[in-house]
Amino acid sequence: GKPADEALLCRAADALAAHEELPLQAAELVAAAYCFGEAGCTLAVVELPDAGLAAVLPKMPVCAVTAVGPDGVSRSVERLAALAGGVMRKESICVTAPEQPKAVLSELVVAAGKCDCELVVPDPEDITFLEAEQFASRVDYGGYTVPLAFLGRHAAGNAAMAVELALALCRKGFDIPDEAILDGLAAVENRSSIRVISQRPLVILDA
């Protein structure tokens, strides 16, 4: 949440200048990774606008492909899944969303096989809705019971992915206790564009 240190950015620029020229987005990603490393970060969570940018992050222990659906630009879900599969790396673990369309899952399985990446798919049968209120819910996934700031199966699927990503990191040698997983999920806030203006009567603003 803080701006990167200018001195770190300068050193990152010098390090980049010593290597082959990269496209702008790739160079920015490498510079950010350098700054995270210099700041002493063990792990960084990076959301890629283009899965192809993963090529400049060859040492990702885990990665994720969230739910894939129509994008409104006439590209098929198969094509979108194939593009998303570009995030996978050799000997990494990729976690994807439960209940992906069959066509999407097929593309991801092929992509994982091609680059020797393990694909983990949370079992939707392991997701149990314990209770739901007007604006929140409580679910259990594989023994991890957490309150969610969102309603619906989509949010529960994302929570299952988060659990599987944490467990994948544990398999890669990172020590993440169950309590930390539960605390992390419980701390998630709903910062979407949807705002509840009034509860009685219920008025919701969707920006």
Task: Name every feature range the model reports, one short phrase each.
Residues H19-V30, C41, V87, S92-V104, ...:
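Phosphate/pyrophosphate-binding catalytic cores of soluble transferases and nucleic-acid-acting enzymes
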Residues E28, T42-A44, P61-C63, S92-V95, ...:
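Structural motif
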Residues E131-Y144:
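Acidic-glycine-rich active-site phosphate/pyrophosphate-binding loop
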